[in-house]
Amino acid sequence: MRRDFGKVAVLLGGKSGEREVSLKSGAAVLAALRRNGVDAHAFDPAERALSELAGFDRVFIALHGRYGEDGTIQGALELMGIPYTGSGVMASSVGMDKWRTKLLWRAAGVVTPDFELVTADSNFDAIERKLGLPLFVKPANEGSSIGISKVKAAGGLQAAYALAAKSDPLVIAEQFVGGGEYTVGILGGAALPVIRIVPANEFYDYEAKYLRDDTQYLCPCGLDASLEEQIKAEALQAFRIVGGRGWGRVDFLMDEAGRHYFLEVNTSPGMTDHSLVPMGAKAVGLGFDELVLSILELAHVG
């Protein structure tokens, strides 16, 4: 593994609702780089002008959510000509937008739970009838399960929409799939082992992701080996369809009949002690430090 990365900025913090998670991810990445002799420096774009990045040779993006994961920072780095980790402008923008990701996947034949765009003047009862109950309501452009709620009873969609709309004007309602939550990490051109997520809460929300210690992460995931390999190949293809590159994560659900549905793509996954890509990497013998260096090795412009 090469170490001549030059001066590296670790982008962390930022202005999104996922700032605290990003600070944790960035601190872990920064420590790993420094342990391996990399000249790495923390850089919080909420506190410093982006023009100050001009003195850096590479950027490790540990930002999550708006401005860091949606193509905004990627576009700035493209203009500055500084190689950065993860996906480019288009894939970051599409991947952040759950609605457009699902539209693209559906057009390409990727199976995803049925969904509807919800607006203030939607026929809420008709959407409930079409998708069935329970259903999930999500802001299209938030991560870490911010603003998500589960509608269990008829007539509950309007209130769930109002909650989600506080986070983003674009809101989707999504069919409930109840057989289990899973994720596939992507590193370079390969999919990592599938991880099954078993939250103690009703679903894998912000609390389960970052604050609780009783969420179970199962790897091996319990799926038949041939099915797991099939899903890994499909996850890699789903990642590529949105233009993903470098590294990322693709989440999927299983229904009770054993059918899988791809849920969303994450182009800048978490790197905290609760995070999933490091778990998948560990399962193939790749430690956290080696994972961080591998991601930085894949930094690019264009």
Curated annotation (Swiss-Prot):
Mg(2+) 1 binds at D251, E264. It comes from the Bacteria. One of its GO terms (molecular function) is D-alanine-D-alanine ligase activity. Pathway: Cell wall biogenesis; peptidoglycan biosynthesis. It catalyses: 2 D-alanine + ATP = D-alanyl-D-alanine + ADP + phosphate + H(+). One of its GO terms (cellular component) is cytosol. ATP binds at residues 128-183. Its EC number is 6.3.2.4. Keywords: ATP-binding, Cell shape, Cell wall biogenesis/degradation, Cytoplasm, Ligase, Magnesium, Manganese, Metal-binding, Nucleotide-binding, Peptidoglycan synthesis. Residues 102-297 form the ATP-grasp domain. GO terms for biological process: cell wall organization; peptidoglycan biosynthetic process; regulation of cell shape. InterPro entries: ATP-grasp, ATP_grasp_subdomain_1, D-Ala_lig_Van_CS, D_ala_D_ala, Dala_Dala_lig_C, Dala_Dala_lig_N, PreATP-grasp_dom_sf. Mg(2+) 2 binds at E264, N266. It is found in: Cytoplasm. Pfam families: Dala_Dala_lig_C, Dala_Dala_lig_N. Binds 2 magnesium or manganese ions per subunit. Its cofactor is Mg(2+); Mn(2+). Cell wall formation. Belongs to the D-alanine--D-alanine ligase family. This is D-alanine--D-alanine ligase. It comes from Methylobacillus flagellatus (strain ATCC 51484 / DSM 6875 / VKM B-1610 / KT).
